[in-house]
Structure formats: structure tokens, C-alpha cells
Regions:
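ATP-dependent carboxylate-amine ligase
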Residues: 1-138
Length: 138
């Protein structure tokens, strides 16, 4: 059997909650599949941390907007990373009438992790979807 690829839908325990690490290079099909995996967990809060997708050309805004709507259907909490870059995701989440008190925008991954620490609880499942270098964040 082939070993799993690092940061490709890797499920791992983190104390009393779980992490789905899908931080390696996100694309629309992969991001949707990762959300399906997250949705399949019955118990616990479903949380996503993502900066969105990059290098999608002229459809980048639209594809991220749509992903925002998909996240709103599945996630109990959404933590976006990078205020400027995550705007299309934010717009998609808002368009889906997602509760604002469950939506957070972090400047960087450290701030996202701090926010996560405030909301995570036992049996939560946290999806890390894509990981951008700090050059994309402000």
C-alpha cells in the first residue's frame, strides 16, 4: 500500500478533538471533498480554518464565493485566514445567511489557532483546508 500523502485529508487526534489536515494545495474539487468528509462526522462541532483557494485565474472570486456557501451548509464555525484574501469566502458565507457570531476572520494562522482554542470542545472536528504562505496574508 502507498503511504498517505502528508497534509492530504489526514485525520489525526489532537487531545480530545480531531483534525482533518487538508492543508496541501487546495482546489475546488478537493475542497468540496474535504467538506464532505467533515460533514460525515456525526458528533461534535464542525470547524473549518481556511484562507481559501488561490491561482484559479479569472474564476477565483466565484469559486471561493461558492466554497463559502458550501462551508456555511456544513460548518458550525468558520475561521477565515487573511482579511483581504478571504473576502470572496466571506461574501459567500454571508450570502448563505450564516450566523455572524460563528464566523471569524483572522489575520494569520496564529490568530486562527487562538480563535480555535476559544471555540473548540471535546469531539469537535477541525478541517484545515489549504495553507498559504504569509505573503498572501496581511
Amino acid at each position: 500500500a502507498l503511504p498517505p500523502i502528508e497534509h492530504r485529508l489526514q485525520l489525526r487526534p489532537a487531545g480530545d478533538y480531531f483534525i482533518i489536515d487538508d492543508a496541501f494545495n487546495s482546489n475546488p474539487a478537493g475542497a468540496a471533498a474535504a467538506l464532505e468528509v467533515l460533514a460525515a462526522f456525526g458528533e461534535g462541532k464542525k470547524i473549518i480554518i481556511t484562507p481559501g483557494m488561490v491561482e484559479l485565474g479569472e474564476r477565483e472570486y466565484q469559486l471561493n464565493f461558492e466554497f463559502g456557501g458550501q462551508m456555511a451548509q456544513v460548518c458550525d464555525y468558520i475561521i477565515l485566514v487573511g482579511k483581504k484574501h478571504s473576502k470572496p469566502l466571506y461574501d459567500g458565507v454571508i450570502a448563505a445567511n450564516y450566523p455572524l457570531e460563528q464566523l471569524f476572520v483572522a489575520a494569520d494562522l496564529n490568530e486562527a489557532r487562538s480563535q480555535l482554542a476559544k471555540i473548540v470542545e471535546p469531539a469537535s472536528v477541525v478541517l484545515f483546508e489549504n495553507d498559504l504562505p504569509d505573503t498572501y496574508n496581511e
